[in-house]
Amino acid sequence: PYRIPLMAGSSQRTLPTVSEGALGYWALTPNIDLWGMWRSRVFLWTDSTTGIRDEGVYNSQTGKYDKHRARSFLAASWHDDTSRYSLGGSVQKDVSNQIQSILEKSIPLDPNYTLKGELLGFYAQLEGLSRNTSQPNETALVSGQLTWNAPWGSVFGSGGYLRHAMNGAVVDTDIGYPFSLSLDRNREGMQSWQLGVNYRLTPQFTLTFAPIVTRGYESSKRDVRIEGAGILGGMNYRVSEGPLQGMNFFLAADKGREKRDGSALGDRLNYWDVKMSIQYDFMLK
């Protein structure tokens, strides 16, 4: 129903997130929700070549999860007509302890205009067998977005900062608001900034244009600096009637460039990416 801290899959990729285990929900009051989840098996974007796998300890030498360790989640969310404040945490023996907060506030400007602010905070600490003497064992991220909504669409600005990058097979830190198909926002000491506009041609058809810049480092050694810039363009069409009602078509193209002086990948990297997804939304009651 909304973005539940740590439990909700946040990847912008065409792959879904799948959890196998048990999920619990309790509406403590009309304004307070409690969520709990125990997960034994999972499928994330990092598992695209292997499929659904056991939760556990990642072995970087073999690329497999050698030891099975279930992961437990707990989250709470308070909301009213214009706000939602959520906090969640997870515990996984020999892997990590994580905490995430999501704050959302909408301010009506007049009957047709609103201003919405969103702020995400995240902290993770590796535990037990996942700790590494040569790499950072903890990280923090802060990211936010401000959106001005109008009858014709919206204008938004977003930013994010990641202290330390981590292997996505262990801890997913690619969760900030700035979005690019090409440029990496998930690197050491990485800042990312984006401005964009969504223009609604019809109630069903929307165009998006959003340039982005990034600044960070290639690794925890901080010996190769990354300076990136890119432009994202997209279109979205939602079927509102007929037998395909609820189907959503999304097409995006992205052009980016990075300066990485001294990198083994090259001093100048050029990217061109295209993404298309067809999604059908429905609800079982």
What are these regions (language model features)?
Residues 16-20, 68-72, 95-99, 136-142, ...:
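Residues that define the transmembrane beta-barrel architecture of outer-membrane proteins
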Residues 191, 198, 206-240, 246-250:
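A C-terminal functional module that forms or caps the active site or interfaces directly
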Residues 1-5, 38-42, 80, 89-93, ...:
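Transmembrane beta-strands of outer-membrane beta-barrel pores
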Residues 79-84, 102-217:
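Detector for outer-membrane/organellar transmembrane beta-barrel domains
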Residues 6-14, 46-53, 98-102, 126-138, ...:
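Outer-membrane beta-barrel translocator domains and adjoining extracellular loop/strand segments
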Residues 35-71:
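Short, flexible helix-coil linker/hinge segments at the edges of structured domains or between repeats
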Residues 73-74, 233-239, 270-285:
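Outer-membrane beta-barrel "beta-signal"
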Residues 1-50, 78-79, 157, 161:
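Outer membrane beta-barrel
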